[in-house]
Amino acid sequence: MLSRERVIEVIQHRKPDRMPIYGWVRANLEKQIAEAFGSVEAFEDRYEFDLAHIFGGPPQYRQEDLSALSARGGGTIEPAALLEISLQDPNEPSGYDNIRSQMEYHKNQRGRFVYVQTPGIFECLNGPFGIQNHLMYLALYEKELHEVYRRQAEWNRTFAMNCLDLGIDMIHVSDDWGAQFGLMFHPDVWRRLIYPHHKITCDAVRQRGGFLSVHSDGNVTQVLDGIVELGYQVVHPFQESAGMDLQDFKQHYMKSLVVMGGLDVQTTIGFGKLDRLKREIERIVGMFPDGGFIFCTTHFVQDHCTMEELKFAFDLVYELVREQGKK
């Protein structure tokens, strides 16, 4: 079974020949991996990664416009001010050059399932607003935020459609809502402000037959039902170290969702505790013998992780998923 086929089997709730594997390793460890393995690409080939996380696309706002607004507001941009400037054109062709080249390599040459980083609604606007101000604006400027979010949602939809046109397999919406023990804001706020604007992109992607995933760090248990309603098929990372429960997922959500995650960068990998690392990898792989899970890091592996530990982890994962697939 090819990597892309394997991932699709899992997302469609069928049992694959083995659990797909992936890892977010490039961002903090590119130099170290290149020294140890030759390149990140060689590392990905060595462990036969089944997916590729692709980045790129046109900018959403001109930095000059944001800087001017910030200067005018004394270092602060409020929602009404942001509405004074336009988003950039999501159809600008050169913005997709990197997506095309990465897709050619990973999908066409390596046979991997490719997913593209796509803006959500809350996280992407923490850039212009600042996260502390943004959280305050949820209470102060709901009317204005509806319009800011509507514009963002329409931009996101166009970007997602363009990526599907290029041959991207899955639209991966990144939108951090979770804190260590729950949401950063009340679930009712999520339902009023976040949900309807995610729905714009989600509906369009599902109508096209594209696959759909969402990333949120932290604990998003309170809105899992809403994530299902939106049509998301994959959730990353389902963070156990923030209090989320994979047993609860298996009992209540496994018929609707697939988890991509398992290797926790906050508590497990990068701390030199190989016995704990081994136990956790064995536990996670053992929980999902019949599908429903894509093994991945919960976020970017941090730069305090040694190459010896990284190799230990992925040697073990590589071996375990193949042993499991033979049963």
Sequence positions of predicted segments:
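Catalytic cores of TIM-barrel enzymes
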Residues: M1-K327
